[in-house]
Amino acid sequence: MVQKLAGEKTSDKDITIPLFSEISLKIGPVFAIREDYPTSRLQKGLILISNGQDLAEEGVGFGVPVLKMGVKTIFPGEIELAYLVEGSCQVIEAIYFMNLEERLTNQSLGSVQSRSLYWIKNHLADLHRRFPPARSFLTALSNKLRSSFGWQTTFEEAGYTYSVKVNYTVDSQAGVIVVKVDATGATMNGAPKGGVPIHGITEVIVMNEQGAQHFDTYSDSSGTLLRGEAIGSWDQVTAGSASFICSTHRLAFRLQQIDGARLFRGMELIGSRVAWSGFGYSLPPTNQRFTYRLSIERLA
């Protein structure tokens, strides 16, 4: 929901910020997000809009926290929002409530409950992430198993909730977003919710994604230029800055290396199930406050 704070403009649904010409940013509660992909159940961050077209596809947007507990991943399923205008900047305060886990479901049998199956699945996903030579085989294996057993990806309540506050300061004239992440805790409906625990959580990832069919080209300050599958699904960026490019809409978004974090790039496009491209900052759980700048650029 969008929460009213003293002196701030509020909205009951989406918050939309115009950038340049037909390009804008949008964030809103999960029920206002398109439902084309399994990740529609997840709470998204700032997504790019061009002439009314959502460019995020399956991507979760800019500045979205994800938590790792070993090989298990926790996703945001709810949000509280507030915003205000400061000169040429608009400030959005988002509190993400981390309360969803990925599950497999069968239309006839419902949610798969086998702990051993999820143990295997999560370890294979971790192998896919960490060992690039195995990715093609693991993707083919996943697709085969899903087809054979009629499995689909869903996201269900995890049974616990952690809160992560993310402030976005958007300079619409410059096309710059300053993102401040605070994992020390927040409140939900007036009740305190714990932040990210130092023990138990093994990694905090701040995702910055849009759609893979739009942003299909990677470029960085070292001169590397990659397209499509050559980008990889989760590879570390070593250059000082890096961008994803959408030639159709003449757009790019760019991030830089930040002390205390590792920057990863990725792109996946698998049928109608997966379509994301972008970056993730990987942080240890002890780093509970983190700030970075994301630039959105209009290309010639």
Give a label for each model feature:
Residues 4, 12-18, 24-26, 90-93, ...:
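Ser/Thr- (and often Asn-) enriched beta-sheet segments in non-cytosolic proteins
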Residues 20-22, 30, 65-72, 97-103, ...:
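Generic structural motif
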Residues 10, 171, 220:
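Acidic surface patches and DE-rich sequence motifs
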Residues 1-110, 237, 243-244:
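Beta-strand-rich N-terminal accessory domains
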Residues 189-197:
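A short beta-turn/strand-edge loop motif at beta-sheet boundaries
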Residues 21, 29-30, 46, 78-84, ...:
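Extended low-polarity, hydrophobic cluster-rich segments
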Residues 197, 201-211, 217-220, 227-300:
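Beta-strand-rich recognition/accessory modules
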